[in-house]
Amino acid sequence: LQAYRRHWVAVHERPVVGHDLQALADLRRRHAPLVRQIRRRFASPLAGAPRRERRLPDGDAVDLDAALDAQVARRAGHSAADDRLYQARPLHQRSLSVALLLDCSSSTGFAIPDRHAPAPDTAADDVLWMAAGSRPSLALQPPRRVLDVTKDAAALLCEALQAMDDRHAVFGFSGAGRLQVDIGLVKDFGAPWAAPAGAALAALKPQGATRTGAAVRHAAQRLLAEPSRRRVLIVLSDGYPQDSDYGSGAQALTYGLQDTAQALREARRAGVASFHLSVDAAAHDYMRHICPPHRYWVVEAVDALPARMLALVRLLARPA
């Protein structure tokens, strides 16, 4: 029938409360080179709001430097003092709101293989260590999960957007069927990117399924309430859309892909641009059915995602 089902999906948005107020400081230390790069690159006038135009014949405010120069010139007896004494905002003032949707489904709890880990012990190694009398103690670190890396990438995005003074919000999403689509509000548009938001981001846990279409529609509606001229939705996921009631077999995959693609089309028609980042190495197989090739990236090395996110921010920093 090509029609929507009324009251078919229930989305529940709730604030995420975190208790680790050191999480943001820890992240900034962990990614210190990238954070320094962000502050150097994105806190500059080239990245943020354009400078006011000065020394104009008319404008919305007096240019104090120009007025002072004109006064000095008059007192010095110069009759042809410059009368361009005003300043104004550029006509194309930067105005951007960004919403980040972070996939928190169960699969994001999978551990990432450590490319720098030593090779597994062999039987010969055991014999050698027994002869030496002991095996050296190694500090065991818990394995990094997909969600740990995507949360770091989300935090670095917030660092850059805050440096540019752009409004931004972060939502985690997961669910368990059409009546339980969970949206965790990590940071709202008007809230600062500070320790409480960092703690909320750190508190996100992998759980449930990936009903991406419903999450996209919800985030798009939140963006449409924003006063900015440009509205951008970024979806960060580790796999294709799936939920318990999508059906079985190929039908389940087709349903999720088509629903997500339709949600993104609706958002675009309403004035919300979108970009999709996937850390699934096989994502090209299905992402081309969700959005055009220039609207998604596949990051095959998950631990390269934070740096890749900064490349996306550079695109956002360009004038509309």
Regions of interest found by a model, annotated:
Residues 114-119, 184-190, 247-254, 289-295:
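Short secondary-structure boundary/capping segments
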